[in-house]
């Protein structure tokens, strides 16, 4: 047991450095090509001329597509093993390392150029790759899946500063591919990754800064639960739209570079209306949580961002949809809160409360992982007072969503690439 805890610690350290490496590579490329050192793609887009804002995501998608197609032609074969940590956990615990690194580099290109796709997916993949590489050298074959799971959880903890949610992500989303008894090493890896990540970044701040002064009362619990019902209905709709957009892009029968370029061009066109569509949505989420906008502003940004996410994910841009889903959930919750705020004197607090609820419940509705989703929002914002209400709402959202749409976003992703 001591040996496993020691290896889990090493995996956590490796994962933290993998995540930090990807993050610093992003910052470097943003500085080189976008003349932006703020770390915010929305700020970068705001400071660009309209024609650069239009073309940059398309050029990034084109470059990523050429890289992926060029690698496949160079090797003259498709990857001989999984390039995704979920697939690796469901098979024999092995990666095609070279193809996975090329995929991560392609993700770096599309993320840095403004596509509305999550950077955290590539971060978690790199963390799992580092764990797998270490495991294949120093551990028996039957443990390889465990250490990939530890690496993925640690990567998630370092990316989102949420070690418990990262651990439960493995238990809930990938349930059946590993035993719950193995959660000990997973949690150790996640916590170590967070601590090392804090040391690297010289900060232990929460991912999102929120000033929620409301004390949750009976009325608020009713609103939280009703938001869970709304998210349970919206989750399957979002998954269906993502699937439909992917099918439409495939039906165009474009070469991968042009398909990714088209997705980027759509994002560029939408960014002419609002630069908030650029990136994974982190900056926009923080601005909404700091000062919730008016109803029509939320609605406008929500629609543009939704189309940008659908275009990016539908075109096959390598990256995650975890953080974009958080923004969509926040916007849905805030739209609901703004509508209700017309009848309540504390409309601002209700909007903020239901925005946080929307983040958790839409995440639960798309991942079918209510406990992880609840802990994720609490850990990212520090608002643990919301935990009881969020847990109930997330369970309701997950049950409704699972009834209407059998597959979660991750099972849908795996089926699409199998």
Curated annotation (Swiss-Prot):
UniProt-listed Pfam families: Voltage_CLC
Record's GO cellular component terms: chloride channel complex; plasma membrane
Keyword annotations of the record: Cell inner membrane, Cell membrane, Chloride, Chloride channel, Ion channel, Ion transport, Membrane, Transmembrane, Transmembrane helix, Transport, Voltage-gated channel
Main location: membrane
Membrane topology note: Multi-pass membrane protein
Cellular localisation: Cell inner membrane
Spans traversing the lipid bilayer: 5-25, 54-74, 146-166, 168-188, 222-242, 258-278, 291-311, 316-336, 352-372, 380-400
GO biological-process terms attached to the record: response to acidic pH
SUPFAM superfamilies cross-referenced by the UniProt entry: Clc chloride channel
GO molecular function terms noted in the UniProt entry: voltage-gated chloride channel activity
CDD domains in the cross-refs: Voltage_gated_ClC
Function: Probably acts as an electrical shunt for an outwardly-directed proton pump that is linked to amino acid decarboxylation, as part of the extreme acid resistance (XAR) response.
Family: Belongs to the chloride channel (TC 2.A.49) family. ClcB subfamily.
Protein name, per record: Voltage-gated ClC-type chloride channel ClcB
Organism: Escherichia coli O17:K52:H18 (strain UMN026 / ExPEC)
Lineage of the species this protein comes from: Bacteria, Pseudomonadati, Pseudomonadota, Gammaproteobacteria, Enterobacterales
Gene label: clcB
